[in-house]
Amino acid sequence: MPKRTSSRFLVLALGFFALYALTAQRGLGWGDSGEFHYRILRCADGLLGGCDSFATAHPLYAAIARSLCSTPYQVTLISSLFGAFAVAGFWLCSRNLALAVAFGLSHALWWLSCVAEVYTMSLTFVAFETLFLMRFLASRRLGWLVALAALNGVHVELHNFALLPLPVYLLAAAASLRGAGAGRIAVSFGLSAAAWAAGASFWLWALATRGLRDVLVGSYGGEAFGLLPSNWTVAGFNLALSGLSFVAPLALAWRAARAGASRPSSPRPSAAGPADSCLKALLAVHALFFVRYFIVSQFTFVLPTAFFAYLLVARVRLGRGRALALAAMQLLLPLVAWQLLASLPVPAWRPRHKYRDEARYFALPWKCGDDSADRCAAEVEGPWDGYPDCGGKARARACP
């Protein structure tokens, strides 16, 4: 990486890490975040942390957090750190600084960088896998394909999100190697398969010893395959929250459409190539998974979809005024959404007993000063007893 590029990468990563760390939740978290705090800090049952399935254990995340963290805030800072790396990785893919800043300020990424979750770490893998894919498509060098396969294999150890883009990667590699000769094709796919298997060795071991269902979906098969009945109130709430992350892509797509309608557009050098087709395919795969995954926290699964949406409009260059306007919109819209959701007569968005205001908690990405989970656990059952057991089989009795 050239010195100038690495300097900008580090400045962007450090800047957003500072933002996320300052606005992150200091104490215990709710729901899955509280479960991560409990498992990482209190459970010593191997990398699975006592989970009832490999699919929900996220062993790579657990291993990193356990080796570095001794307090709930430190566990949350893992999300902040990888959220910042994801922003910097997006910039490496797009080379559009203004849009990278807008992406870093988007609702879902900021929100998930302030709580204990695995999704920002997963997004960092997505960013660098995309970078390696684009480098391979541009150069046709085998090293980039092998690096992509190895990185995706390690990603599988973190989250099954990594399996979604595999068909796109395989088709892109096959199309790029078409006509290269049987020997080169065999070597390319053989080395890539070996690299992927090396990266995913623990996942493959779990697959062999625990079975396909345990590794892929665990007890969440109905949700993963979209077989459960939909709660349209919750779905509407999640779509509204997810929409807060697409301000910049929609604005830039509208601007590009207007510009294209008013004058003939000049051909973009890389737009017609395979990279553009791959980005669209990756967007479609992740968007399809997201829209039919009806769970209470559905909006937290929107990050890869938002990443590719931002990347596809990254070629639209922004002046300083428009960049500042987009940043202001990203900052103000959560406040507007909070007020709107709080004013609607929907029980799911009203304050949750005396501890948590649902509209505020989900609409505002920053979590500094939010000690609602600490107060709930301490008042009801003690600092840790209000959280799930190591197996994660039951939510908190009084603080679900």
Which functions belong to the PLM regions below?
Residues 10, 97-101, 190, 194, ...:
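Signature aromatic-anchored transmembrane alpha helix within multi-pass, membrane-resident enzymes
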Residues 100-101, 144-159:
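Membrane-interface alpha helices of multi-pass inner-membrane proteins
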Residues 23-38, 48-64, 73:
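Extracytoplasmic catalytic/substrate-binding loops of multi-pass membrane glycan-assembly enzymes
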Residues 119, 170-174, 185-261:
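Transmembrane-lumen/periplasm boundary regions of multi-pass, lipid-linked membrane glycan transferases
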Residues 164, 292-318:
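Hydrophobic/aromatic-rich transmembrane helices and adjacent perimembrane loops
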Residues 10, 77-97, 128-132, 311-312:
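Transmembrane-helix motifs of polytopic, lipid-linked glycan transferases
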Residues 31, 111-119:
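Short acidic/glycine- and proline-prone juxtamembrane loop motifs at membrane-interface regions
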Residues 57, 61, 65-69, 75-89, ...:
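Transmembrane alpha-helices of multi-pass, membrane-embedded glycan-processing enzymes
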